Amino acid sequence: MRKFKATIAVVGLLAAVAIDTVKAAEKIVFPAPGGQQTVLSVHGATDLSAMEPLIRDFQTLAPNVTIEYSEYVTNDLFDGTSRECNERQGTMDLVLSSSVDQLVKLVNDGCGTNYRSPLTLRLPSWTRWRDEIFGFTFEPAVIVFNRDLVPPEDVPRTRVELLNLLRSKPEKYSGKIGSYDIAQSGIGYLFASYDARGTAILGRLLEAFGRADLVVKCCSSDLLADLSTGRLAIGYNLIGSYAVGAQRRGAHIGIVIPRDYTIVLSRAAFIPRSTRNPATAFWFLDYLLSDQGQKKGREASFFFSFEGTLPEEVDGPLWLSTSGLLRPITIGPELLAVQDRAKRQRLLSEWHRSTQPDGNVP
């Protein structure tokens, strides 16, 4: 189990120098069921378990399309896409990521392709930008807990309740609280940056995380695995869709919508300007936005929807979209500030200073 303090020694280096290599992505090939006529190369920071139902459903409409799906962590996807853009290579036809601030930067740097259709135009305004980035999911950040380790009276439903729990029962929950490593996880950093917006309690919560010896991981799958096995008791700011998926696969976890405010993102897609197969990329994008694609995503992949009710497994208001709790991450130029290097370093330093008061601040 890699703990938060293990990242302190390397964060300054990671923030100060460029990464020369991108970790190899895991590529899965979905052969064309009707015989291959073309190949679509999709690169995503989205779990294969979420993408596979959508890919196979799309192939019922496009049986002659072979789809190659390459899965990354968010920062590696950003680095690889940026490199292809700068070098004008063409191995990526469609890019999907929950770290929408990174996609905004790529589009702002001229890496995207313009596309407009009746399906893109009907999207909520906060989920699209410049006809180049398109959000296709509705995913809240949630609190997840292990049902065997956290009794009902301890389940936190607000950040104040989580703070008070860590203060009142430090021995019980020391080393048992997990969240994203914001130095490695693009979505973790994005969620933290939104937590920092006008949230007076954030500093106290981070200090409590430090006293509780916060455990950090790069990825949702690692955090959910530790929550399922009992290595962790509570996970903070996890992507709700992945948590529901883990629970439906048998993980003995509970899922809570925070009642003070709920950050919600729309996982987004964009088509690189160097795509070799724009027509099929546009087709797959329209599928993701279509009624059929949205229905399949709600049933098999992401479980939440823009207008629907909460999944029955989730503790929260039935109609989340009208609950008044939402703090949506608007896809647009304001996200460029999240990628500003100086602001990023300040947030990383504040995070580490608060959680490691006796350690070195990068």
PLM regions and their residue ranges:
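Periplasmic-binding protein-like
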Residues: 125, 138-139, 205-210, 248-273
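Extracytoplasmic ligand-binding site segments that recognize negatively charged/polar headgroups
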Residues: 45, 49-52, 90-91, 97-228
